[in-house]
Amino acid sequence: MFALTAYRLRCAAWLLATGIFLLLAGCSEAKAPTALERVQKEGVLRVVTRNSPATYFQDRNGETGFEYELAKRFAERLGVELKIETADNLDDLYAQLSRAGGPALAAAGLTPGRQDDASVRYSHTYLDVTPQVIYRNGQQRPTRPEDLVGKRIMVLKGSSHAAQLAELKKQYPELKYDESDAVEVVDLLRMVDVGDIDLTLVDSNELAMNQVYFPNVRVAFDFGEARGLAWALPGGDDDSLMNEVNAFLDQAKKEGLLQRLKDRYYGHVDVLGYVGAYTFAQHLQQRLPRYESHFKQSGKQLDTDWRLLAAIGYQESLWQPSATSKTGVRGLMMLTNRTAQAMGVSNRLDPKQSIQGGSKYFVQIRSELPESIREPDRSWFALAAYNIGGAHLEDARKMAEKEGLNPNKWLDVKKMLPRLAQKRWYAKTRYGYARGGETVHFVQNVRRYYDILTWVTQPQMEGSQIAESGLHLPGVNKTRPDDDEGDGKL
């Protein structure tokens, strides 16, 4: 009897111990943090991306780029810091994303369509782009997919474009192409530009951001329908972070954040065209080095990015110190006599004085804008006022407010400026008629020149990298002695 009781007690103890163990194990498993909880606990959102003008790069003021700005807003939503990690190529990017303890997500202008997409998951899309076949101006233009046969083609290894070509090869077995993990989009466009390859495939947004550096490249045709860019997250069944990402992207689209970022980074990329791009590339090499030190000096004195000042100068005069217009404005920064006197400029044709005066005038205008206008919109408003005057700009802001738009956002106010040239609108304003449409183009052009200068002068683009890229970087390429300054008239 005693032995039986002891046996029962041992069994009960064993069952109790087993139950406690299973309970603890179950609690331990239940307490394993989700992907979202890990990010919040660490206080850091790790994001892997690519180094390119359409995604992420660093300039004098720090980190920037479309994907960087979007990821930064997402990190702010989560209440954590953003940590950017860069990948050498797409294969490296996806490898980092799939590795245990790797980044939380990839934000790199990705289009779903890779052959190994099963290893990752994609978010809702946030920007529509079109894959395009790129060729060199002067060569026979391909017009259909079968025209790719017999051409020297290179694309990014592991890209959706490589997957597209793999599908096309099933239809045309004789099609040949190379995939490379040692290049970026900039390199592929340069190779087409100089004739090292015949064709490449890139997305429309990548081309828009880079075409100005390579004026010989052209779009042959769209290679398929438009598709959306998305963020990539590691595979698995943990939806915590994915749900938060999708909610953020949906809200960003609904509340206008995506539109503002598109306007900032892509809203002004089509204003140059072939002739403008080719001419600007020449002037970067031949003219700007003569005046670069003056722009830098003014920028330092006025605590303003010298490249923005240089962009204004190019829009005004094409960096010609003797430029003159029919209205009497003169010099590299095209100052009126009244403005020159107010800024202490005694000789408008002296490039150093003109740059100092124009720069001082721009910064003064910017400082006088309402405090409710914040950067980067503040600089765009200042450019508009520099061109059209503060009074007319204020008319456009009031018009925007009456239309239910935001008078402190350039994206909204620029829609109103062309109305200042239409009687049914300007008749209701305080200051009357103005060529507001020209002002919109002025701001677009300056922004485009500024973007180019920002990219080609970023810190990592130095030395041999510049030579290899083929970009015309002021201060590096030598000025040609036979450069024609022109007759000084616009």
UniProtKB/Swiss-Prot annotation:
HAMAP family: MltF. One of its GO terms (molecular function) is peptidoglycan lytic transglycosylase activity. It is a peripheral membrane protein. In the N-terminal section; belongs to the bacterial solute-binding protein 3 family. The lineage of its organism: Bacteria, Pseudomonadati, Pseudomonadota, Gammaproteobacteria, Pseudomonadales. Keywords: Cell outer membrane, Cell wall biogenesis/degradation, Lyase, Membrane, Signal. This is Membrane-bound lytic murein transglycosylase F. GO terms for biological process: cell wall macromolecule catabolic process; cell wall organization; peptidoglycan catabolic process. One of its GO terms (cellular component) is cell outer membrane. The gene is mltF. Residues 33-269 are annotated as: Non-LT domain. NCBIfam families: PRK10859.1. The N-terminal domain does not have lytic activity and probably modulates enzymatic activity. The C-terminal domain is the catalytic active domain. Residues 467-490 are annotated as: Disordered. Its EC number is 4.2.2.n1. The active site is at 316. It is an enzyme of class 4 (lyase). Residues 1-32 form the signal peptide. InterPro entries: Lysozyme-like_dom_sf, MltF, Solute-binding_3/MltF_N, Transglyc_AS, Transglycosylase_SLT_dom_1.
